[in-house]
């Protein structure tokens, strides 16, 4: 299969630049994966499509305000740091711009000097290994000095950092939000539980690889970046019970979906587990755990568009996307949602 098989026309004005005020009032396109039938709803109507035997699996990762603006100690030149992956307590793999100013031994200063950094090594694909120096708790300093690392297609500044976090976010470590979860409010989750639907939480820390374009023509040649995940015993039991009782395992977002399929890759059963996944799901893949998916609208030619095509069929997905464009749905991270049932 070719990457160009997953292209579609998207007018730029349909790329959502900011979240809507009420999370659960985004639009919802409901797609029947068997028939290709489409319905147009509001996100909170998701309640009508859930049954007491079902289980919603949500990713409770929390986005780090991982974008730091600082200066080179020697020259005062402005620098931008993006934290990618923690290597040790104070050592991070980091993207540094401009890279030519960030040679080994270069030192940098942030804020009023409460955070300092030194490049101690070179990482993959032009990244730098950086050691940070500070007093106190790193996360608290990052909270004061850091900015949200919004995707490159969002040009507007975010007024409230919490709008780029899910209401159930808990485990810090992501470079991007698991955006399907942004549509849930505490009130909606309560109503879902009152209906008898189980909520199960896992963690996958989203890396920047999620925004990297596919650069090969043949999708089978694409290599995914690995991301850290973990699932506890309680969540595994809820998912296995749901399967045994004939309910649906509904993944909230492609991150939950990829984690479930990684852990359940052997025989569809899941267990307590943590590790790194680079699973790449595209048409031809047979889902082992996930029965249905709540997700946003993805970029043309992206691995996430391939993942949803593997669940609902490429033709059904491409048709639904063309309908979404025609009906002026909002796309990408702050956009509207789709329920593939």
From Swiss-Prot:
InterPro entries: QueA, QueA_dom1, QueA_dom2, QueA_sf
Main location per the UniProt record: cytoplasm
GO terms (BP aspect): queuosine biosynthetic process; tRNA wobble guanine modification
GO terms of molecular function: S-adenosylmethionine:tRNA ribosyltransferase-isomerase activity
Top-rank taxon: Bacteria
Top-rank EC class of the record's enzyme: transferase
Metabolic or biological pathway, per its Swiss-Prot or TrEMBL entry: tRNA modification; tRNA-queuosine biosynthesis
SS bond list: none
Any single GO CC term annotated in Swiss-Prot or TrEMBL for this entry: cytoplasm
Catalyzed chemical reaction(s): 7-aminomethyl-7-carbaguanosine(34) in tRNA + S-adenosyl-L-methionine = epoxyqueuosine(34) in tRNA + adenine + L-methionine + 2 H(+)
Keyword Ribosomal protein set for record: no
Keywords carried by this UniProt record: Cytoplasm, Queuosine biosynthesis, S-adenosyl-L-methionine, Transferase
Compartments, record wording: Cytoplasm
UniProt EC number: 2.4.99.17
HAMAP family assigned: QueA
Subunit structure, as described in the record: Monomer.
Function according to Swiss-Prot or TrEMBL: Transfers and isomerizes the ribose moiety from AdoMet to the 7-aminomethyl group of 7-deazaguanine (preQ1-tRNA) to give epoxyqueuosine (oQ-tRNA).
Similarity comment: family membership: Belongs to the QueA family.
Protein name as annotated: S-adenosylmethionine:tRNA ribosyltransferase-isomerase
Organism listed in the record: Clostridium botulinum (strain Hall / ATCC 3502 / NCTC 13319 / Type A)
Species lineage: Bacteria, Bacillati, Bacillota, Clostridia, Eubacteriales
């Amino acid at each position: 299969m070719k990457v160009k098989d997953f292209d579609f026309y998207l007018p730029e004005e349909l790329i959502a630049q900011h979240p809507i005020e009420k999370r659960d009032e985004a639009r919802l396109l409901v797609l029947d994966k068997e028939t290709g039938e489409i319905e147009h709803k509001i996100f909170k109507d998701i309640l009508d499509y859930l049954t007491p035997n079902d289980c919603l699996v949500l990713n409770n990762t929390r986005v780090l305000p991982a974008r730091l603006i600082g200066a080179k100690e020697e020259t005062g030149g402005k620098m931008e740091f993006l934290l990618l992956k923690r290597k040790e307590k104070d050592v991070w793999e980091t993207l540094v711009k401009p890279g030519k100013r960030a040679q080994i031994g270069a030192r940098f200063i942030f804020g009023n000097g409460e955070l300092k950094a030194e490049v101690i090594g070179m990482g993959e694909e032009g990244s730098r290994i950086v050691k940070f120096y500070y007093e106190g708790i790193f996360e608290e300093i990052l909270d004061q000095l850091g900015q949200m690392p919004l995707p490159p297609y969002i040009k507007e500044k975010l007024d409230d950092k919490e709008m780029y976090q899910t209401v159930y976010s808990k485990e810090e470590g992501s470079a991007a939000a698991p955006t399907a979860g942004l549509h849930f409010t505490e009130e909606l989750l309560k109503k879902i539980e009152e209906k008898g639907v189980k909520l199960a939480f896992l963690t996958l820390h989203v890396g920047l690889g999620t925004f990297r374009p596919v650069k090969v023509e043949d999708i089978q040649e694409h290599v995914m970046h690995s991301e850290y995940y973990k699932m506890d015993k309680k969540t595994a039991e809820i998912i296995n019970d749901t399967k045994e009782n004939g309910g649906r395992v509904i993944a909230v977002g492609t991150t939950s979906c990829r984690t479930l399929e990684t852990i359940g890759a052997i025989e569809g059963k899941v267990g307590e587990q943590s590790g790194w996944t680079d699973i790449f799901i595209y048409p031809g893949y047979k889902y082992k755990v996930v029965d249905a998916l709540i997700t946003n609208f993805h970029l043309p030619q992206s691995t996430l568009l391939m993942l949803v095509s593997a669940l609902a069929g490429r033709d059904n997905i491409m048709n639904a996307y063309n309908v979404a464009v025609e009906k002026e749905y909002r796309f990408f991270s702050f956009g509207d949602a789709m329920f593939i049932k």
